[in-house]
A protein has these predicted regions:
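Anionic-ligand binding region
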Residues: 148-189
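ATP-binding/phosphotransfer module of carbohydrate and carboxylate kinases, centering on a glycine-rich
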Residues: 2, 8-17, 43, 47, ...
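N-terminal glycine/serine-rich phosphate-binding loop of ATP-dependent small-molecule kinases
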Residues: 1-106
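Conserved phosphate-binding catalytic cores of ATP/NTP-utilizing and phosphoryl-transfer enzymes
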Residues: 3, 9-10, 107-138, 260-267
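Gly/Thr-rich phosphate-binding beta-strand-loop-beta motif of the actin/hexokinase/Hsp70
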Residues: 10-36, 130, 136-157, 173, ...
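Glycine-rich phosphate-binding loop signature in dinucleotide/nucleotide-binding domains
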Residues: 64-68, 133-135, 223-225
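Short beta-strand-loop/turn "lid" adjacent to the catalytic site in phosphate-handling enzymes
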Residues: 64-119, 154-159, 165-166, 194-205, ...
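A generic "binding-loop/recognition-motif" signal
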Residues: 23, 105, 145, 236, ...
Length: 271
């Protein structure tokens, strides 16, 4: 049996992984242990379970995947109001009714955190994604609406840091200043912007990279993990790819992979 006592016949069973963020919801279809399809939806806090069921069935039709083959689904949400509606909607789609919401109680990870109930399920999923890759010392930088840093040492989740995301920073500037325009965020040619737009690009992107590099260096020093791998994930990780040497690997689907690993390695009795 694999870790967690899951019978072999369920190890690579088709499943859905749902990462519900503040801005977007990403649905991943796993089969044979690999991500087959991925869809990015707008997060709608008022969505009902009926609407969610209908949308998921539509996605399965588009992906030409019969829902009758699904064996499980896992949810990680930072929008608590959506957990119940997604859970109920997916229960009607997955024939086995095996739908699990990831949290600090059932993640199966050692947590060195003052108040584990406050840990976002997406951050736990990232830690599980590391476990699936056999990485025990790491800093995961998840670049989304917020930019989060998740620290794992010896397989134990320690916490991390939370900062405004790149786009969130821009919207805050635009909303609180009279003269700064909203711009399409682009990679700047140089740090010194010769126009307001270029200066914004520099501050938003290169400034963000500077924050990343400083925090990673400090985390490695404070936690005594100088060789910790740095893994970047999240929607904005694609934009920053190649702009910093601090990142060892870009894994845009790490959160989904962690949810897949969660289903495949944690017994239902722990849910």
């Amino acid at each position: 049996m694999p870790k967690g006592g899951i019978p072999d016949r369920f190890t690579f069973a088709p499943m859905l992984a749902v990462d519900i963020g503040n801005t977007h919801t990403v649905v991943g279809l796993f089969s044979d242990g690999t991500l087959q399809r991925k869809w990015r939806l707008t997060t709608r806090p008022a969505a009902t379970s009926d609407e969610i069921e209908m949308r998921v069935r539509q996605l399965m039709d588009v992906g030409r995947f019969p829902v009758s083959r699904l064996r499980a689904a896992a949810i990680a949400t930072v929008v608590p109001a959506l957990d119940r509606s997604w859970h109920k909607g997916l229960e009607r789609v997955v024939p086995t009714g095996d739908v699990r919401s990831l949290n600090h109680r059932n993640c199966g990870i050692a947590l060195d955190y003052a108040n584990p109930v406050q840990i976002g399920p997406d951050r736990l999923a990232n830690a599980l994604g590391l476990e699936s890759k056999g990485i025990s010392d790491a800093v995961v930088i998840d670049l989304g609406t917020a930019t989060t840093f998740d620290v794992v040492r010896g397989g134990t989740y320690l916490g991390g840091a939370i900062a405004p995301g790149i786009e969130t920073g821009m919207l805050a500037l635009v909303g609180r200043t009279a003269r700064l325009p909203q711009v399409a965020i682009e990679v700047p040619e140089r740090a010194t912007g010769r126009t307001t737009e270029a200066a914004l690009h520099s501050g938003l992107l290169l400034g963000h990279i500077g924050m990343m590099e400083h925090l990673v260096a400090r985390i490695r020093l404070e936690e005594g993990i100088p060789n910790a791998k740095v893994i970047a994930t999240g929607g904005w990780s694609v934009v920053l790819r190649g702009l910093t040497r601090i990142v060892d690997a870009y894994c845009p689907d790490l959160t989904l992979e962690g949810l897949d690993w969660f289903v495949r390695t944690r017994p239902v009795s722990e849910m």
